[in-house]
């Protein structure tokens, strides 16, 4: 388990819970606007943190923390993810998994073992634009399968799309929302310009507040829960 960083306290990562956050190292996507390049680009990797250090910390925080969010990078790339989550669950913590949905077989295994209590999946955009947005070829069937697994798992979940122009347009978001069941929560994430994976991207921006508000109203005609973050 390659852990590139962690946050001992968070009020925002697991909805309505006090938690810690674990950042795994490594990702199979290369989204140019990624804000965690040190977890994606091997040339920027730092020293890893022993999983045992995290487990020891969590053991001492029982009764004070409720949950642990596993994010990245892409956590499902970690071969021993299930073993780590088992140890976290044995300590009595809820587990939230952030994923890009590219590994449905891993998701199915984690769900079958009851190792995840909440899943947040990033849907980058329409399937036909995935390669351009993710910076690599992506199997669209894997994305669709992951959406189906997550939405049918019977646990709290959300799907998220980052609103970053020119990689994605408002019409692209509407198309993307069509991949999501009406009863699932869909989160429109504002893009915040900061450190990026790629350089020389030119002008990239979040949608304006007016565009986001209009988009939310439009999506709410088809989805039961649309949030802006």
Question: PLM ranges: what are they?
Answer:
Residues 1-18:
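Short, charged low-complexity linear segments at domain edges
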Residues 6, 189-191, 228-229:
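Conserved beta-strand termini and adjacent loop/short-helix elements that scaffold enzyme active sites
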Residues 37-68:
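Conserved alpha-helical substructure of the radical SAM core
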């Amino acid at each position: 388990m390659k852990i590139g960083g962690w946050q001992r306290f968070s009020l925002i990562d697991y909805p309505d819970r006090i938690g810690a956050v674990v950042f795994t190292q490594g990702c199979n996507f290369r989204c140019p606007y990624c804000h965690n390049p040190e977890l994606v680009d091997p040339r920027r990797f730092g020293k890893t943190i022993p999983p045992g250090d995290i487990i020891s910390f969590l053991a001492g925080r029982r009764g004070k923390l409720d949950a642990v969010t596993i994010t990245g990078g892409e956590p499902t790339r970690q071969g021993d993810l299930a073993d780590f989550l088992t140890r976290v669950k044995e300590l009595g913590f809820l587990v939230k998994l952030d994923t890009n949905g590219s590994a449905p077989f891993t998701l199915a295994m984690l769900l079958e073992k009851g190792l995840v209590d909440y899943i947040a999946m990033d849907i980058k955009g329409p399937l036909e634009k995935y390669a351009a947005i993710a910076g690599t070829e992506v199997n669209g069937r894997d994305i669709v399968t992951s959406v189906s697994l997550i939405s049918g798992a019977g646990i709290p979940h959300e799907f998220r799309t980052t609103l970053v122009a020119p990689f994605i347009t408002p019409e692209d978001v509407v198309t993307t929302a069509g991949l999501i069941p009406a009863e699932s929560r869909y989160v429109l994430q504002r893009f915040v310009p900061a450190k990026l994976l790629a350089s020389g991207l030119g002008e990239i921006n979040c949608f304006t507040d007016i565009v986001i508000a209009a988009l939310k109203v439009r999506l709410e005609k088809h989805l039961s829960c649309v949030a802006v973050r």
